[in-house]
């Protein structure tokens, strides 16, 4: 395991690329991999790179979300800043690896809201839109999301290779 989203994405991409390069049909393939998660500033960027495993992999996101809300009980909005992070790595056929970071900034809301999305989306509040990530339309979420930003960045790099 790496210590950052970027390191984890690079490890995934380069390990898969090693396997792919042994198969003739994938010899010159570009391999993409990502590592994503939620950083909450007040909680020293927890859950961070452990977002999926926070409180154990078998713990439901309903419980994870409620636990985070409980930990932030009484914390004012200006100290509830958070971001979704997505690092995307592209392992190139020549052995090099490009990595980018996409982010979506917001705050942790005060309640679980919304049915769209998954994971921490129901507690991730976007003040400028007045709703959680789970309340956005799929189209709007793709436009604003950390993954969408990361994919747009890596695409720009790959188009110039």
Set out the residue ranges of the language-model regions.
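Anionic-ligand binding patches
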Residues: 1-161
């Amino acid at each position: 395991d790496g210590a950052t989203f970027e390191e984890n994405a690079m490890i995934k991409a380069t390990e898969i690329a090693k396997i792919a390069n042994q198969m003739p049909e994938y010899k010159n393939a570009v391999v993409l991999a990502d590592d994503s998660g939620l950083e909450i500033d007040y909680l020293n960027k927890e859950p961070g790179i452990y977002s999926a495993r926070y409180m154990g992999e078998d713990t439901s996101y309903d419980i994870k979300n409620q636990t985070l809300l409980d930990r932030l009980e009484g914390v004012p909005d200006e100290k509830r800043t958070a971001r979704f992070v997505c690092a995307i790595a592209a392992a190139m056929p020549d052995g090099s690896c490009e990595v980018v970071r996409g982010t979506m900034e917001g705050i942790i809301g005060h309640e679980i809201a919304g049915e769209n999305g998954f994971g921490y989306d129901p507690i991730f509040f976007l003040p400028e839109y007045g709703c959680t990530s789970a309340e956005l339309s799929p189209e709007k979420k793709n436009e604003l999301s950390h993954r969408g930003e990361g994919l747009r960045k890596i695409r720009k790099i790959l188009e110039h290779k």
